[in-house]
Amino acid sequence: MKDVQLELYTRPTCSDCQAGKAFLAKHHIPYADHDLSKHPEKEKDLRKLTGTRMVPTFVFKEKSLLGRLRKPDVFIGFENNINEIRRIVMEVD
């Protein structure tokens, strides 16, 4: 199993965010949920990662063999990126 951490940037009114969360729950994938309505300071991190404020944003962080973090895989949107997200999740699952 890969050592992957997932951070998810969301807003409660975003239907694509809710679909992404449901998918992760179905597959029992742990993640850090950054609800931007509750933690507006996280928008700065989101902009730094993506250059935008769009949600949902999935950030998969993987450690190398030496324990260093590799460049994260970042996906904006669930529906448009479901195949890539599924591939990463199934590798971890």
Model-derived regions, located:
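Short, surface-exposed acidic/glycine-rich loop or hinge patches that mediate macromolecular interfaces
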Residues: 11-14, 36-37, 79
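Non-catalytic, surface beta->alpha helical segment in thiol-disulfide oxidoreductase systems
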Residues: 62-93
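Thioredoxin-like thiol-disulfide oxidoreductase module
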Residues: 36-54, 64, 86-92
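Short acidic loop-to-beta-strand element that houses the catalytic metal-binding Asp/Glu
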Residues: 57-58
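Local sequence-structure signature of Cys/Sec-based thiol-disulfide redox active-site neighborhoods
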Residues: 1-29
